Amino acid sequence: MENYTVYLDAETTSGDQIHADIVSYTGLLVRDKDNKIVDEFTYFSRPRISRCYQVDAYLVNGFSPYETEKHEYSNHGLAKKLNETFTRWKNKGHLKFNAFAGYNFDFLLTSQTWFSNLYSFPWLFSTNASQMDTLPIARNMEYYRPEILKTELNKKSNKVFKLSSLCNLNGFPIAKAHTSYDDTVGLKNLTESITKEDLLEQLSKKTISCRDVTFRIFGL
């Protein structure tokens, strides 16, 4: 069976993954051996009228509540389409799901969407599949090899690890930031840039070295 990576991104009505409703969701199915996109989707859905939205969220993703009311899918319809599409993709081979800050948001958001729509088995990301988050990988890469990634500094002189900033500074700018499709393409480009085989090998050696030191300190 072939190995694939599913890059995904969601735009929502809130920054709270438990109470947010998805208004736009993109997935790219990429074959690992040649990084070719073999399938993709972008679904637009209507938020539930029982949920409050955050104005800030709409200001970020560029949607308006009047626009999202006209989207094709209901929240339940979106949950069904995501379940069907990801299940179909899983039948092609082994999948690795990747989202930027996915551990803290996108994976939880999607699973909560399935759960709140009474799907009895919302753990599709971790069953016969694996999860990946490019954000901590980028942080580790930059820590061990600062020359790998260019990062901007905020007003406090701290490094910024926002997706749009990293993509813009490293040669593959996002056409329209905070749209699910363009952010997903940017995530794919960023991930492929920092996960080259030689860089991963060096990072693995550094990680193992730190682990061995920790084991010696604690007598493990």
What are these regions (language model features)?
Residues 2-117, 157-168, 172, 178:
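Conserved non-catalytic scaffold segment of RNase H-like nuclease domains
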Residues 131-154:
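Short alpha-helix plus adjacent loop in nuclease-associated cores
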Residues 20, 120, 144:
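Catalytic phosphate/metal-binding cores of nucleic-acid and nucleotide-processing enzymes, i.e., regions
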Residues 115-128:
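A short alpha->loop->secondary-structure connector
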Residues 10-14, 136, 186:
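Short, glycine/acidic-enriched loop or turn micro-motifs at the edges of active sites
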Residues 15-17, 139, 189:
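Conserved protein kinase catalytic core
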Residues 169, 181, 185-220:
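Acidic two-metal-ion nuclease catalytic site recognized across multiple nuclease folds
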